[in-house]
Every structure is written in C-alpha cells, then in structure tokens.
C-alpha cells in the first residue's frame, strides 16, 4: 500500500465502524415494517455485515445473486431492486442483498473512493467466506457502488463473481468517472451494463463514449443496453427483470 493511502487507514477504520452501526439500524427499521424479513449476520474480527438472505423456492437452484444497492437504497426500494427481490427467487436464484454503503459528503474525492473500495472489498470477501454461496455467484450492483465494484474487478478483488450486471454506474467525482470509462468494455467475465434516462447525469453524460469503446474493443463478454424512454413504473421494472434473466440464460447461467 502506498504512503498516500497509509495516512487514510485510521480514518477508514473509524468510518467503517460508523457504517456498520448505521447499516444495522436501517435493517432493524425494515424488519419492524416487515417482520418476516430473512436476515443473516456475518462477522469477522473487525467487521459485521447484516444482509437479506432469501433462498429460491425452486427445486434446482441456478446459483446465487448478490445485489449491492446504491447509497440511500435498500432491499425494498420502490424501483428495480425491490422487483428483483421479489422475482429472482422465483426464477431459481438464491438471493443476498447487502446494505447500502454510507459516505460523508465532505470527503475528498481520492479519500472517498479509497474508502468505498475498502468497505466494499471487505464486505464482499466476508460474504464469500461465510455465506456458503451456491455457485455461480452473480453480482448486480447499482449506481456508484457498481462503478466501485467494477474498479475493484480491475485490481485485486479475490473471489470474483462469475458475471456482473451494472445498473446506471457512475462515480460522484466526474474526473474519476471519466477515467474508469476504458475499464468497462475490457472485462474478462460476462458483463451487462444497463443505463436509462433516469440514471445519474454522469452515467448519461458518458453514454456515447461507452458505446464507442464497446464497438472498438468488440469484446463479446460486454453488452450494453441504453433506454432513453425508460421509466421506473411497474411494467418497465418487470421488463428490466426479464432482460436480466434472459441475459443470464444466454450466458449459460
């Protein structure tokens, strides 16, 4: 680890402890509203993560989907995440939904991104080690979390997913966001990127560059779908769910 990151370690440890407390409170609030919520807690020496863990109702599970919501989102968010929560177990997938990450608005861009990577990497490894996940493991990540996970896949993330689905990926710092563009199309696993006109403006601002990069690289593992007229209504959410399930089947999952 470089010297510029060593100075961040005490801050990262403090923030991670704060995140765990906030995430636990959010799950308890959801559980009070939904008493049948199936929660599972994973613990290590310095990390505790509580997740929603739903097993498929089918006799032959297809694998495990891990959903990583964006900030201020959760398993019951009234858009695509909630629709996936309801439909994926019926389609044969065991489902784990992580709590959304928390960040502080006054962080410098470099510190924020490093903190996001550290938190997400630690959570991912803990779930992989203790979750007894049925393979293949598919990651569905949303918004800024999707961009952070994609960056980790280009670095040293162990126990990588078999495939990833990215929903409106962006980084809150625009310069960092632009720097990650070239990474999206150069994937070594099946990768589906879904972007709509209702996603973050940064995701929209670079859509043409992403399309051009996809054409230039001609990577058969990378697929992108952009929907200019997409709306977050029930029929569109169902359409997106069917698009995801169809893509998974096309790739042999």
Go through each PLM region and give its residues.
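The feature captures the conserved acid-bearing segment of alpha/beta-hydrolase catalytic domains
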Residues: 158, 163, 168-223, 227
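N-terminal cap/lid segment of alpha/beta-hydrolase-fold proteins
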Residues: 24-58
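Residue in the alpha/beta-hydrolase core beta-strand immediately N-terminal to the catalytic nucleophile
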Residues: 136-139, 163-165
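C-terminal catalytic histidine-bearing segment of alpha/beta-hydrolase fold enzymes
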Residues: 218-253
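N-terminal signal peptide c-region/cleavage motif recognized by signal peptidases
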Residues: 18-20
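Gly/Ala-rich beta-loop-alpha elbow adjacent to hydrolase catalytic centers
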Residues: 140-150
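Short, surface-exposed "cap/lid" segments of acyl-processing enzymes
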Residues: 56-93
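Alpha/beta-hydrolase active-site loop
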Residues: 106-132
